[in-house]
Amino acid sequence: LIAGLFLNAQYYSISFVNVPQENVAEFERLETTYWSKVAKHNIENGNQINWGLVSRVGGGSDTWNYAFINVYETAEQMADVSVWDPKSILGIDPEEISTNHLTVGYGVTHWSVKASIQGSGEAAVWNFARPANLAAFIDENQKLWGPAFEKDMGGRTNWGVGQKLNNIEQQYSTVMTWDSFESV
């Protein structure tokens, strides 16, 4: 669910994971049964704004098929990994519900929200780019696309642009935009 995912957000992290098909059911069970409750606890206690587990539909990458989005008001909240302790929250040892052994690839990126229009939606398109002029790209999105979408979302229910804060290397994107829709 993408609804309101970035409401009041200033920062977000995306954890990309590659889960082999034979591990998907157990991965989804552990994430939706246990880790979603840890995230809910963090949201209710003001440690983050939102959490989402999404699966990829189509696309050109074979390096990930699931992603976690954690949304925060501050960079300090985003950096505080101590809040992800299922032992203190659920009374369950982290090793009992770990999904690390079910994945064959993992990567985390951290982002700053530069502009967004809130709304609901069950599906999203993520666009990753590495523009030659990052500042101009963000400025164009803030001053041209944001106001244009405020007038006519063109079927979108949510839109935004974020700047990457880590993994800034030649082969990686430095910016992403997202467009949410009611369904795929």
Task: Describe the residue ranges of each PLM region.
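Short S/T/G/P-rich N-terminal loop/turn motif that feeds into the first structured element of a domain
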Residues: 9-184
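Bacterial Sec-dependent N-terminal signal peptides
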Residues: 1-11
